Amino acid sequence: MGADAEPGITPTPIRLHRQAEKIIEESKIPFTFLRANYFMQNFVNFSSHSVKTQGAFYVPAGNARISFVDVRDIAAIAVHALTSTNGKHEGKAHIITGGEALSHGHAAEILSEQLGKKVNYINVSDEDARKGMKDMGMDEWIINSIVELFEFAKAGHWSAISPVTEQITGNKPISFSQFAGDYAVAFK
């Protein structure tokens, strides 16, 4: 989400996505863009180990509210776009979000409920996040991109809720609570 935001405030990864979209648009190849917000599954990829070992996860997100989206909803929309024969998705950019905008603190509460154990969200400074990622061996450009993305979130750019999932699939977006229950084994 944000690929069409103002160039001066848009994080590098999103700007690069938009550049790729422009190339596709100019090619005149039929397209449908799926502009998905922050994936719920990022919690599994980036936080499950620390939740298992420390009962906490560490993110430089402050109190930013984010409409996290489950990748299963993105996949369902992709199926509709790819199998539609009426052309209603052609040339469109679908903004895909979850059905609720949550802070990481609220996400920790939901994880706690679903896992049956206390999970804490620790808001870390950008500097501490950079150090932690560097210590993990991450490349500098990835570190910078992640910090930029969370700055974008803290500025309120990922809190909007889009009706696209329900409009296209006929189903409400998967809730964070359902995600946490479905993926509980990854955090235990």
List each model region and its residues.
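A hydrophobic C-terminal alpha-helical subdomain
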Residues: 127-188
